[in-house]
Amino acid sequence: MSCRKPANYRYGEHTADVLVQAFGCTLEEAFKNAAVALADLTYYSERVEPRMAKKVEVEYDDLEGLLFKWIDELLFLFDAEKFAWGRNIEVELRQGVGYRISATLHGEMYDINKHGFTGLIVKAMTFHMMEIKKVDDYWVLQYVVDI
């Protein structure tokens, strides 16, 4: 599917935090790009090889809560398990009573010598300035993380 999204993601200026805007032709693609943007804040995701896979499932009543839980779960994967995911991410989003993401992230254990370090450590996800909207033919997921 082709659309006129401006990029996969971009960062914005924000004091002591980082504002992230992730884009996608579909909500699934936007959630995937939100995960890649999060990774690229700390390490270089293009250096990650798909040596193992991690399943992630999150659900919430609304899309904003789902985005919060998605990013929060990914932070846990990196902080607690030292799992570095690359750009190969499969995301399935389902809507029923609420919303549910079932995803598979391909990656490997984080190695600073291989994956590098950008100098930023993401501490937490916030609800500050969170926004999810459809613009023309693409989706925008905006969120802020504490660094």
Curated annotation (Swiss-Prot):
Keyword Ribosomal protein assigned: no
A GO molecular function held by the record: calcium ion binding
Family matches, as Pfam families = Archease
Does the record's keyword annotation contain Mitochondrion? no
Q: Where does Ca(2+) bind?
A: 17, 146-147
Question: Which UniProt keyword terms apply here?
Answer: Calcium, Metal-binding, tRNA processing
- Swiss-Prot/TrEMBL GO biological process terms: tRNA splicing, via endonucleolytic cleavage and ligation
In which family does this protein belong, per the annotation?
Belongs to the archease family.
The record ties this protein, via PANTHER family, to: ARCHEASE, PROTEIN ARCHEASE
Q: What does this protein do?
A: Activates the tRNA-splicing ligase complex by facilitating the enzymatic turnover of catalytic subunit RtcB. Acts by promoting the guanylylation of RtcB, a key intermediate step in tRNA ligation. Can also alter the NTP specificity of RtcB such that ATP, dGTP or ITP is used efficiently.
The protein depicted here goes by the name Protein archease
Taxonomic classification, please? Archaea, Thermoproteota, Thermoprotei, Thermoproteales, Thermoproteaceae
